[in-house]
Each structure stands twice: as C-alpha cells, then as structure tokens.
Swiss-Prot record:
Main location: cytoplasm
GO molecular-function terms, A-Z: ATP binding; cyclic 2,3-diphosphoglycerate synthetase activity; ligase activity
A Gene Ontology biological process term: gluconeogenesis
Compartments where located: Cytoplasm
Gene Ontology terms: cellular component: cytoplasm
Coiled-coil blocks: none
The enzyme's E.C. designation: 6.5.1.9
Catalytic activity: (2R)-2,3-bisphosphoglycerate + ATP + H(+) = cyclic (2R)-2,3-bisphosphoglycerate + ADP + phosphate
This protein's name: Cyclic 2,3-diphosphoglycerate synthetase
Family statement: Belongs to the cyclic 2,3-diphosphoglycerate synthetase family.
Tree of life domain: Archaea
C-alpha cells in the first residue's frame, strides 16, 4: 500500500483528486500549511483516507508506517511547506525502514539488505578521510579480547574476487606488500591495512560507485560475506568505504563522523540516514576543530539519534615497530595541522627524530617530489593507505631505508572509554553480558 504526504497549501478537493489518481493509498500525513484548508477532521473526510497530523511531521510519518503496511510514500506537498532539507530528512527515515520515497521529479529506492548468519557489525562513515579504517582496526583489536572477529572490506581498489588475508598468521612486511603491488594489486587496500593493524582475518572486496544514500553501484560484498560465514570467526565486521557501506542488515552499527567535515553534510542530505542507523557514534578529529563546532555537531546528532552513544576522539599515531632513536620522515594523508600534531606526538612519546614530513600520501606526483627532497634519514614512517606501498615503500627500499608502518589510534578526549563501549557491543552481539 501507499502513503501520501500532503499540505494545507493545496485545496482539499485537489489533494483528494490526486490521491484517487495514485490509487492504493491507505493513509496520509499532514505536513503543515493552513492557507487552503479548514480543520483536520474535515480534511480527513475530504481526502477519504486516515490522516496523521500533529506537531512533528517526522513523528507522524514514523507512527503511520508503524501502524500501516507501507511500501511506497508519495510526496504531494511543495514549497513552502517542505524544503530540500526536509525532504532529505524524510527520505532518511523512510529508507531506514525500507520504504520507497517518490515525488514529482525524484525517487529514492531502498536497496535490498541481505542477512548474514553470524553476528554482524557495520562500521560506516559520513565521508572519506574521517578515520573509518582506523576505527575498524581499533574495533577489531578490541573485540579480539572476547571473540574472533573477521573484517569484510569494500574498497575502491579492492580485488575482483574476495581475497582472504590471514592477518592472525601472515607476516605483512614492506617487501611482501611491494610484491603484492608489483603483481598488479592495490597493496594499501583496506583489507591489508586492517590485517596489519589488527592482526585478524580480513576479506577484501571491491566496489565501484557510491550513491547519495550510501550504497555502491557495483560490489562483490555478498561473495565476501559467504566466505566469512564459512571461516572460523564469531563476529563479522562490515567496513564501509568513504561514505558508502555494505547493503547488509547488520545487528549493530557504528557511524564515524569527522569533526572537520562541513556541518551540512552531517545534518542534511543523507547524513541523518547514516547517523540514524548508529548504536554508537565516534566523532573523530575532535581535536582539530573548535569547541563550538563540536558542541554544534553533538546537538545535531542528538536531535537525529538521541539513543546513540557519542564518543569524542582524537587520533594518535602508533608505530607498529620500535622507532626509538631513529631519524625518520613521516608520510601521511593528514592535513598539515594534523601532520604537525602527529610528528610532535611521535617525538615526545617514542623518542624518534622527525627530520621530514609529507602530507601528500594521497597525491602520488607531489609525494614523489617530497621524497626526492628529504635527506639524512634512516626510516620512513607511513600510514598503509593510498600511495604507501607503490611509492613510499618502494622508494624507501630502493635506497636502503627502513619502512615502519603506523596506525592511527583513537583516543577519547571526553573522559569516556571507547574500548568499553566497543566491548559492550561485542557482548551484546555474542548474546552475553559482561
């Protein structure tokens, strides 16, 4: 059956005429506007279907879809009652419930969400470079304390067929990754990074394209899931890519929000859809913006999803091998301010001398220029992403330099404990309580 969204800017007989033309309409939600209508009771009688109305149109939409079997919602409203932001917010609610949303010249259709036969956790982001892979690695390392997690990724440089990396067994060295790159694969793909930083089994998949809601045009995640179901492991972590995430009906969701993002990408468009899914929300890079912006982001999130637990975090670089006493260059995707903070942290915490820095890990030509300028170093510290292997690692090994990969560890700056929050999710997924 269908539901229609109506307003008081249309005469009731016009609305009734449109409802009749649509057909199979079980109910309507009144969005606002009073210019051309009388009271709600007479409007309901005129349109001939049950009418939901009240102060909050979002609450009324939720109530209507809970009380009726709705497969499609038709928007018969218009400006000034609804603006673009309103419509995106309505779409977010409807798509979360698997309901198509259609207007005069637009249509948002839900993607079929597949089920998985193991407890599952999706980690998605509100954009690229928000630290989603770092959070996934942290979550996997944490869940290892109580379970055997498997990570399924969906990178834009992933393999054509699902690829299993036994991070719990395989020694992932710079030489190994260079050989992978020379074989034609993207050796800095997310499943390699996760395997290196968390030491769990990962399954690399590929995807192409990303829609407005967050689903890919093509991907092979379903094949990866089938492998995960057969492997030893009791929790499957489904890791998104950029603002895209797997079309899987997960048991739990963690949404990663970058504090440096534009506010409208969080509160508008399909930011509310991603936030609305979350059981746990991790705001990353919270040390890179003002207190006022953090407070604004928190208020937006709380207005969209008041039940989600929110954690404010900053990333601290964590070398995966000993670096004490070394003269190193630091290569990252971080912006200049973040790169400087990372360098200071490494020098103060690990007693290493940073003699050169590059923020151009995601820009191959500029990275090559940067590397050609550096002198008097013995070690390259680099994140495993972007051009880390085919440029940074290959160049370092060519000149006899040591390569040490670094992880970005999320650290709470709000006196909360992200590790405990992740463990709580893990216990719930296992059907147990700590």
């Amino acid at each position: 059956m269908r539901m229609v969204l109506i307003d008081g800017e249309h005469y009731p007989d016009v609305t009734a005429w449109a409802i009749k033309k649509i057909g199979d309409v079980s109910c309507a939600v009144f969005l606002g506007g009073t210019e051309k209508i009388g009271d709600m009771k007479s409007l309901e009688e005129k349109i001939g279907v049950k009418l939901y109305y009240g102060e909050s149109y979002i609450s009324n939409i939720k109530k209507a879809i809970n009380e009726n079997k709705i497969g499609e919602v038709i928007d018969l409203s218009d400006e000034p009652v609804l603006n673009y932001e309103d419509r995106f917010r309505i779409a977010a609610v409807l798509l979360k419930h698997g309901i198509k949303y259609k207007g005069a010249d637009f249509e948002f259709s839900p993607k079929e969400m597949v089920q998985i036969n193991k407890p599952s956790l999706t980690i998605l982001g509100t954009g690229k470079r928000v630290g989603k892979t770092a959070i996934s690695g942290f979550v996997a390392r944490t869940l290892k304390e109580i379970s055997k997690p498997i990570i399924v990724t969906m990178g834009r440089g992933g393999p054509e067929e699902p690829e299993i990396i036994e991070g719990n067994k395989l020694e992932i060295t710079p030489d190994f990754l260079v050989r992978v790159a020379e074989s034609g694969k993207h050796a800095a793909s997310d499943h390699f990074e996760d395997a290196l930083t968390s030491r769990v089994i990962t399954i690399g998949c590929r995807r192409c394209g990303g829609g407005m809601v967050g689903f890919s045009f093509f991907d092979i995640v379903n094949k990866g899931i089938k492998l995960a179901e057969k492997l030893e492991g009791d929790i499957v972590i489904l890791e998104g890519s950029g603002a895209t995430f797997p079309a899987v009906k997960a048991d739990k969701y963690i949404t990663v929000v970058g504090a440096t993002q534009r506010i409208e990408f969080i509160k508008s468009y399909f930011g509310p859809f991603r936030i609305g899914l979350a059981d746990l929300i991790v705001i990353t890079l919270a040390d890179m913006v003002s207190k006022e912006k953090i407070e604004k982001i928190q208020k937006i999130i709380e207005s969209i999803n008041p039940d989600a637990e929110i954690h404010l975090t900053a990333f601290k670089p964590r070398p995966l091998s000993e670096i004490k006493g070394k003269k190193a260059i630091l290569v990252m995707t971080a912006p200049p301010e973040g790169l400087e903070k990372a360098a200071r942290h490494l020098e103060n915490r690990y007693d290493v001398e940073i003699v050169g820095k590059s923020a151009n890990l995601a820009n191959r030509p500029k990275l090559i220029e940067d590397l050609s300028r550096f002198k008097y170093y013995d070690t390259v510290l680099v994140e495993l992403k972007a051009a880390a292997v085919d440029v940074a690692t290959k160049e370092a090994l060519k000149y006899g330099k040591e390569v040490i990969y670094i992880d970005n560890e999320p650290v709470n700056i709000d006196n909360k404990n992200l590790r405990e929050a992740v463990l709580e999710i893990g216990w719930e997924l296992k059907g147990e309580r700590k």
